[in-house]
């Protein structure tokens, strides 16, 4: 090869090498896409639309600070329309087509279960912001809502101790979260010495509207001379006619209190709260809690919505915490690469809105305070009980035989269902 040709070829190769290295660099300098996977229509829109909006607000705020790694964030919003198989399709669209770095989404456990195989197959990250049944610790999911030991179990303990409840109605929507939560609660109550005949379990479909017979059964069950309470895992817009029927049949909170796990400020906004006054909800956040951080968040939210009546709620705060943790993890990793961000997240801390600091744990759950709130006539809550500190989320319930020896640990064990007795991953 002559010298001239060698020089030309060398220059061409050098140019090609520079071009090859430039392409990823230019891709790295573009916006970072963030997926938002919440139902904007259908039965769950009453709860999920707000979560889409709070993510848009958080992304807008982060962009004002310069984005992440010097890159702007670009929200990608889809509507899975309360259709569980559609959640999986929309998740695939976000990850494979839109190339999002992470997704914030889902409310119901059936929607989360629907998307899990997609996030595992395509190796992407989901932040899930709603209380759920536990019995799960997935590498690709970070659970920023409550596990049963951060909501359901403390609520039952409160009712037994403070309200002297002896008979229990476990009422839920017919899907995995209420069924598993009630299985845990039934085992817990039986272990506490509650008789099986003092536990009534009932399930209704999504969007259920005719509560007359069920509420009549609850009233009858509560007339046996023992203090009775309803533990409600009823989800979505079915809550409105349920509480209305309680009022229609003259059931007051002083007679049969209801403690709800899926009724918050958003669900109470714009409905007649008279039938609900005095009933309870268990959450890890309430709008009514006075802290400088919460006051600032409420003010920011009302300004963003251009609505002085806009309310805040627990899953919104879970997105606030989860988003802050994701930003910190990306900055710590120096990249949006999912494997590196997943490894960076355990140990990351972010302030919650009620005065503490939440920490992401090796089981991909976080530490949270627990509050019991009493519904007021303005749709807000009076906090009547709270934990002294933050409660670490348990992925696996000690109340269930198949789970009590399991832990999730993605740092040391690299396993979501490690059996501490057999020292084996896989739960066996």
Locations of regions flagged by a protein language model:
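Extracytoplasmic "Venus flytrap"
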Residues: 35-54, 78-85, 107-110, 174-179, ...
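C-terminal segment of classical bacterial N-terminal signal peptides
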Residues: 17-25
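Extracellular/periplasmic periplasmic-binding protein-like sensory domains
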Residues: 245-320, 330-336, 386-422
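Solvent-exposed, acidic/polar segments of extracytosolic/periplasmic ligand-binding ectodomains
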Residues: 349-428
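Beta-alpha junction/loop-to-helix N-cap segments that form part of ligand/metal-binding clefts
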Residues: 46-53, 65-135, 144, 203-212
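Periplasmic-binding protein-like
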Residues: 94-106, 127-129, 169-172, 225-236, ...
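N-terminal secretory signal peptides and thylakoid transit peptides that target proteins
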Residues: 1-14
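Extracellular/periplasmic Venus flytrap/periplasmic-binding protein
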Residues: 89, 133-134, 140-249, 288-296, ...
């Amino acid at each position: 090869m002559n010298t001239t040709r060698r020089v030309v070829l060398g220059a061409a190769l050098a140019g090609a090498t520079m071009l090859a290295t430039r392409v990823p660099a230019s891709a790295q300098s573009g916006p970072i896409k963030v997926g938002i996977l919440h139902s904007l229509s259908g039965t769950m829109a009453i709860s999920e639309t707000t979560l889409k909006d709070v993510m848009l607000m958080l992304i807008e705020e982060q962009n004002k600070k310069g984005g992440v790694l010097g890159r702007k964030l670009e929200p990608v919003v889809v509507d899975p329309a309360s259709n569980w198989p559609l959640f999986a399709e929309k998740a695939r669209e976000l990850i494979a087509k839109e190339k999002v770095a992470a997704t914030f989404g889902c409310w119901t456990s059936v929607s989360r279960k629907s998307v899990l195989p997609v996030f595992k197959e395509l190796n992407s990250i989901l932040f899930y912001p709603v209380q759920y049944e536990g019995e799960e610790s997935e590498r690709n999911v970070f659970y920023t809502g409550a596990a049963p030991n951060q909501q359901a179990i403390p609520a039952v303990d409160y009712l037994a101790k403070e309200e002297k409840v002896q008979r229990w109605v476990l009422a839920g929507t017919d899907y995995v979260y209420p069924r598993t939560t009630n299985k845990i609660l039934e085992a817990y109550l039986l272990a506490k010495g509650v008789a099986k005949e003092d536990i009534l379990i009932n399930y209704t479909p999504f969007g259920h509207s005719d509560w007359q017979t069920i509420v009549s059964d609850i009233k009858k069950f509560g007339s046996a001379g023992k203090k009775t309470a309803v533990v409600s895992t009823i989800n979505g817009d079915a809550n409105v006619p349920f509480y209305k029927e309680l009022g229609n049949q003259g059931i007051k909170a002083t007679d049969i209190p209801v403690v709800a796990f899926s009724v918050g400020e958003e669900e109470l906004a714009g409905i007649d709260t008279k039938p609900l006054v005095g009933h309870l909800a268990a959450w890890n956040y309430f709008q009514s809690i006075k802290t400088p951080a919460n006051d600032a968040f409420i003010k920011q939210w009302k300004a963003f919505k251009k609505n002085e009546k806009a309310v805040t709620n627990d899953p919104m705060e879970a997105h606030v915490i989860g988003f802050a943790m994701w930003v910190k993890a990306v900055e710590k990793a120096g990249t949006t690469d999912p494997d590196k961000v997943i490894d960076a997240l355990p140990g990351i801390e972010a302030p919650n809105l009620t005065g503490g600091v939440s920490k992401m744990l090796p089981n991909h759950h976080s530490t949270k305070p627990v509050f019991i709130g009493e519904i007021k006539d303005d749709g807000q809550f009076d906090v009547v009980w709270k934990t002294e500190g933050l409660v670490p989320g348990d992925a696996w319930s000690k109340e269930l035989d198949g789970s009590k020896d399991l832990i999730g640990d993605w740092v040391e064990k690299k396993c979501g269902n490690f059996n501490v007795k057999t020292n084996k991953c896989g739960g066996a």
